[in-house]
Amino acid sequence: GNYASLSGNTMFWQVRLNHHATGAGRSMTAYKYSAHRTDPVVGTTDQRTMSGMWCDPIVGRPEWQFLGGGSAYGLYSRFGQATPRASGGFTVYRDDHWLLAGTGLRYGDQLGASLGAVGYETVGVRLGLDEYGLPVAMQADAAPQTEVVAFAPASNLAEGEYPASVAASADQCDLEFVAERLYGDTSADSLKRVRHGNAVMLTCRPAGESGGTVATIGSTDWVYALDDPAVSRVTTNVIDRLNREPLR
């Protein structure tokens, strides 16, 4: 089938649903940041069900293989010290893509900036530029037929960079956590590898020609900008296109 994700921080954590021995229902298990140390499935034949990041090497099923992007490549925008003075919009690159049909937007335009379409949590990709200067997904295990339409800068946050309201309880240290899990340590080099990310708009075909289309708009605050005519039109394009395409 087809799938649309109009949010950020989508599919960052794997969870497990456990049946109670009494038959009284199920519970959700999520060890999250401590999973690689404390989840009892680690070291067993079931360790791929560890309730940590989907992209953790122990799990080995990064969300970008389905969504086209993931929060390891940019988790926050305009939140704490993550791109605090960014425009709040996506910069358009592939202006001929069906996502942007009827918007009138052209290469270099801002989508949704006036109402802050890009903000809080995000989904991004490892970006590069092709021979035409257009963005492409660079991760080796990217979803097939990934087309990056627009993006905005985003970042993981380090200790001390969260808003005071969050830091008052405990800094999550996402920058250090992601660096350690993906690159094995929190050296300056590893931290830089997960510091400079993005919020992305893209489409992909995770199952190739035999499967459906996934449309990802990687920003939690997208919904707050629906009064922007271009944002509304993009949302309509997603719904109409994915409902019209035959299911595979």
Which ranges hold each PLM region?
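A glycine-rich, often tryptophan-bearing local segment used as a flexible ligand/cofactor-contacting loop or short
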Residues: 1-114
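Extracellular ligand-binding/catalytic regions of CAZymes and related secreted enzymes
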Residues: 12-32, 37, 91-94, 98-248
